[in-house]
Structures are given as structure tokens and as C-alpha cells.
Amino acid sequence: MARMGLAGAAGRWWGLALGLTAFFLPGAHTQVVQVNDSMYGFIGTDVVLHCSFANPLPGVKITQVTWQKATNGSKQNVAIYNPAMGVSVLAPYRERVEFLRPSFTDGTIRLSRLELEDEGVYICEFATFPAGNRESQLNLTVMAKPTNWIEGTQAVLRAKKGKDDKVLVATCTSANGKPPSVVSWETHLKGEAEYQEIRNPNGTVTVISRYRLVPSREDHRQSLACIVNYHMDRFRESLTLNVQYEPEVTIEGFDGNWYLQRMDVKLTCKADANPPATEYHWTTLNGSLPKGVEAQNRTLFFRGPINYSMAGTYICEATNPIGTRSGQVEVNITEFPYTPSPPEHGRRAGQVPTAIIGGVVGSILLVLFVVGGIVVALCRRRHTFKGDYSTKKHVYGNGYSKAGIPQHHPPMAQNLQYPEDSDDEKKAGPLGGSSYEEEEEEEGGGGERKVGGPHPKYDEDAKRPYFTVDEAEARQDGYGDRTLGYQYDPEQLDLAENMVSQNDGSFISKKEWYV
């Protein structure tokens, strides 16, 4: 017994030593089982699970390749390849699993007609000696394409005024999908959607969406589409709403130009209703139709020529299975027809403001051009103005005082030019005026004048700072027929600092006041 216990202990130690030796053998870590980390496939399709043994050592012997599935913490054999015994596939995979290229380095299998139960973790294991077993695992996901459809409500959709209750109009379903689908709606309707997910026992999910709204006349014939997005697929299916509503009544035929003696006019009652209106009734505000007016279903005929008795408010009532609604129109009768302006006349009338604006702009430009010409002419005239000393606008100086004469007067001409018929050489008077001889002749020639002294008349005038306008005119009248002894250009005057040149050619002192 002691020997047997010793032998057992020695065997265990020997096995451990062999394992450690195999673990530390050169190249042991390079022996790798290569698989895909994850795979997926749809129900009913085939999937290939790859598995290979990389870089086996020459001294390592492969004894078996095994595929297993991890189930609830345990391993269940799926398929086995043994070089000595061949291929073995276990139930329930016997009819759906096969090795593609069984060998010491390749353990790839094909799993056909996938089922939801095939989803899980699969292990590919290579048994070697003396290195031991090498394995890797992959995750297989089985997907289920959903079945999608849309259906409208079986109830009748009716638009009723005063009712705000939302009713179910359509349901969109994406059934038995794995993973679940994403459901949405595409529409111009002003409703709201609600969603529900149902998890089925087999792992699939059914998504249901219901669309609700308050029916209205505007919702009739509107499109409502269900959109289902699943994986890389997109499903779209739509329906058209059928909303029933009361008639919406309008009356046509009155063009605003009904006049006396007009013929062949009528009114037509049009009702927008679902279902269509089946009954029409014509009345007036007075209750009865005028003489010569005849109602035929939806049309009101005016027999014979129009007269004033046919004027009034006409009412049409339309009825369908949902209800009765009415519309009205007021008919006015005029004595004479109204002739609207032809379109071409209206178009020309619209162009009148443009023509007027163009004329006004042209006139303004012409006025500006003329004013500019006048301004330019005045500026040129101002620069070339020589002065006019005979105007009444002057404050006339006496020609002798310091206040009435510029400080720097141009030099007197030494030789004055007289007409050819003049025999005597005359001496110029002060300021180039008449000579002393002429003054003496005017006084009668009896007076004597001191040689070299000023004439008494000039001496008296020199004492006056200026002449009045009347005196200036009188002096001009007295000297009107005379000519200046000489002429000069006012622009060439060297004006004193206390004198200011005026626009009219005159000079005004800055030091004296003029009244």
C-alpha cells in the first residue's frame, strides 16, 4: 500500500514536470489558434466559422480538432476531426455542420440554415502532444429580419367641428426582428405617434407604432408613410387617409357685372364634401325665388332678361350623409354694363408714372444746366468787370478828400490826348477831370487864379467827404457831355490797406462810416 501511494505521488509529480517542460519549450508561445472574434448571420442563411493552427513545431503532434459551444457554463461538442477516426458531427448539428478542409492546421466549418438557437460562443480546440491543448473562441450572433407592414384603422374617420379627441388612423408593425427595428412616420399631418416593443420567447422583438390625430377636412387624401430602419435595410409603406366631412359650399357665376336686359346668366352651387353632396336647395333671404329664376339641382337659372327684381342674396344648401352646410352670394343689378379697361390700357397706365418721372428728371437736368451756365457767365463777368462810376448805387466821394479817394492813385498822364480839332494844349485838372481853363471859362473868365494854387471850387469840394446821390446826379448832368482826361483799368490799382474793393467796382474805406 505504501508503495502504491509513493508510486501515485511520483506519477503526479512526473506529469507536472512534463507539463512545465512543455510550457517552457522553445516556440510554445508561438502556437496560436486563429479564429474570427465575432460573426453574424441571418436566420435561414449559412455562416462559415474559420479556425486554423499557426506555426506548429516540428516535434509537436496534433491529435484532434474539436468545435464546441459554450452553454450555461459548460461545453457541448459540435463537431470533431480525428486523423485516425475521421469526422464526427453531433446532434442537433449533424445535418447542418461540415468541415471544409479538415487537416492538422485547418479546422474551418460551415454552419447552414442558421437558427436563433445557434447564437452563442463557439470554441475551436487543437489537441497537441506533448504541448497540450490550444483553443480560441468566437461569438456568433444570429439576426432575424423583421416583417413590416402598415394598416389603416377600420373605423370611419369623420371631421366634426367642436371635437378635439384624437383617434387612431394607422398602425405600423415591425414583427419578429432581432435586434429590434427603428420605426418612424413620414407625413404632413399634425398628429402624434406612440411606440410599443414586445419581446418574443425566441429572442426576437416586435415593434408597434400607432398614429393618432383629430380628423379634419384638410386631412382628407393626405399621405401617411411608415418608415422602418433595420440594419442596412429601409422599409417604407404608405396609405392615404379617407376623412369624411360636411359640405363646404361656394357659389359661382356672379361676375359683378349683371345689368338690365342681360341674358343667359346663372349661379352654380359647388360643394366640397366627402362623401359628395347628394341634395341641393336654393333660397333667398326673403325665402322664395324671384319670378324668372329657376333652380335645377345645383344650378340656378335666370330666365329672360335681367331686371331689378332679380337682385338680392341667394343661398344654396348642400347635404351629404355627414351633414348640411350652406353658402350665399349677393347679386347686384346695374342699369348699364361695366366695361373694364383693356389689359393694354392698364399696362400703358402703369407706364405713365415712369414717363412723368423721366420728364421731371429731364427738366431738372435742363434747369441745372442753364443755372450752371448763368453762374459761369457771372463769374467770368466778375473777373473782367471794369467798374461803372455813373451808377446811383455809389456813395460818391468828392474826389479830393482822403476818405473819398484811394491813397495810391495812378499817376496823372503827362500828355493828354485831345481830339484832332483841338488847337490848344490843355492842362489836366485834378483827378483827370476838366482843365483849369475850362473851369475859368464857366465862371465867366473874369476871375483870377493864383498860379500853382488850387481852384476855389475844388478847394470847397475837397472839404466835403462825400456827395449825396442827388448831388452826384446833378454833377453828372453838368459833366455828362465831358470825357475824362484819361482812362485806366481799376484792376491795376494798388489799393491801400484801409480800402475795400466792392463787386460793382467802387471802393469803401474801412475807417469811416457811411450813412
Curated annotation (Swiss-Prot):
Bilayer topology reads: Single-pass type I membrane protein
Q: List the Pfam families.
A: C2-set_2, Ig_3, V-set
**Do you know which SMART domains this protein is assigned to?**
IG, IGc2, IGv
Per the record, the GO terms for biological process are: cochlea morphogenesis; heterophilic cell-cell adhesion via plasma membrane cell adhesion molecules; homophilic cell adhesion via plasma membrane adhesion molecules; positive regulation of viral entry into host cell; protein localization to cell junction
Bias category Acidic residues: which stretches?
436-445
Record's compositionally biased regions (Basic and acidic residues): 446-464
Quote the subcellular location field of this record: Cell membrane; Cell junction, Adherens junction; Presynaptic cell membrane
One function term, GO molecular function aspect:
cell adhesion mediator activity
Q: Which InterPro entries match?
A: CD80_C2-set, Ig-like_dom, Ig-like_dom_sf, Ig-like_fold, Ig_sub, Ig_sub2, Ig_V-set, Nectin-1_Ig2
The segment(s) forming the Ig-like C2-type domain are 145-243, 247-334
Q: List the disulfide bonds.
A: 51-124, 172-226, 269-316
Q: Which family does it belong to?
A: Belongs to the nectin family.
Task: Quote the protein name from its UniProt record.
Answer: Nectin-1
User: Organism, per UniProt?
Assistant: Sus scrofa (Pig)
State the taxonomy lineage. Answer: Eukaryota, Metazoa, Chordata, Craniata, Vertebrata
Q: Which gene encodes it?
A: NECTIN1
